[in-house]
Regions:
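A short acidic, Gly/Pro-enriched loop at the edge of an enzyme's catalytic core
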Residues: 94-105
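Class I SAM-dependent methyltransferase SAM/SAH-binding core
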Residues: 38-40, 44-95
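A short SAM/SAH-binding and catalytic strip from SAM-dependent methyltransferases
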Residues: 104-117
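Conserved alpha-helix/loop element of class I SAM-dependent methyltransferases that forms part
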Residues: 16-36, 50
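Conserved class I S-adenosyl-L-methionine
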Residues: 136-160
Length: 193
C-alpha cells in the first residue's frame, strides 16, 4: 500500500495509539544494540519520530518509504521537531536505497503483510544489515482479530514469517510481546554465514 494524504489520520488515530503504545515499543528498541536504524515503510513517522527523539544526540535513523506524500509529511515533522539525526529516503523499486551491511537495526512496523515477494524483501533487509545486526518486525497477528487493521486474510501467519526469515538467512528468532493484536519478532543477521 502506498500511503496518501487521506491515510494520515488513520495512521495516527487515537485508537491506533492506544493499541500500539509507543513506550512499550521503545522499551524493546532500548534493549537492542545499535547505532544506525533503518525504519522501512516508515510512512509519516509513527515509529521513526519517537526513535529519533529518544536518541536525538547519539544515533542515526534512516526513514524509507515509497510514498511521496508520506515522506513529505515526515520531512515537515522532522523539521518542526528539529531532528538532525533522521535521513529520509524514497524507494521506487524492490531495492532498498541503503548500502550493504550499513545498519545495525531494521524496523518493520506493520509493513510485512503489505509486501509482495516477501522472501526477496527479507533478503534485501539481510543485505543492508551489518553482520550481527537485528531485524525487528511487528505485524498484525492473524490469530488476534480486534476488528481493526488489515483483513485477517491479508495477515501473515507466524510460522510463514519464521520460515521466510530462516530461508533469508536470519538466525536467533525471538518472540516478544509488545502490542495486543500483533506479533513481534527479532532476528539476527549472523556474524558469519
Amino acid at each position: 500500500m502506498v500511503i496518501s494524504a487521506r491515510d494520515f489520520a488513520k495512521l495516527e488515530s487515537p485508537e491506533r495509539k492506544s493499541l500500539q503504545n509507543i513506550d512499550d515499543f521503545l522499551g524493546l528498541v532500548r534493549s537492542l544494540r545499535w547505532r544506525t536504524c533503518a525504519d522501512i515503510g516508515c510512512g509519516i513517522g509513527f515509529y521513526t519520530l519517537p526513535i529519533a527523539q529518544q536518541w536525538r544526540n547519539s544515533r542515526k535513523i534512516i526513514a524509507v518509504d515509497r510514498s511521496t506524500p508520506a515522506l513529505e509529511e515526515l520531512d515537515k515533522r522532522v523539521d518542526s521537531l528539529e531532528l538532525g539525526n533522521v535521513q529520509i529516503l524514497q524507494t521506487v523499486s524492490d531495492r532498498i536505497p541503503i548500502e550493504d551491511a550499513s545498519v545495525d537495526l531494521v524496523n518493520l512496523g506493520n509493513v510485512y503483510h503489505e509486501v509482495k515477494g516477501r522472501l526477496n524483501f527479507l533478503k534485501e533487509i539481510y543485505r543492508i544489515l551489518r553482520p550481527g545486526g537485528t531485524l525487528l518486525i511487528i505485524d498484525w497477528d492473524p490469530e488476534e482479530d480486534l476488528g481493526i487493521g488489515p483483513p485477517v486474510s491479508d495477515r501473515i501467519p507466524r510460522d510463514q514469517l519464521l520460515q521466510n526469515l530462516e530461508f533469508a538467512g536470519f538466525t536467533d528468532m525471538k518472540d516478544h510481546f509488545v502490542f495486543v493484536g500483533h506479533y513481534t519478532y527479532t532476528a539476527k543477521r549472523p556474524i558469519k554465514r
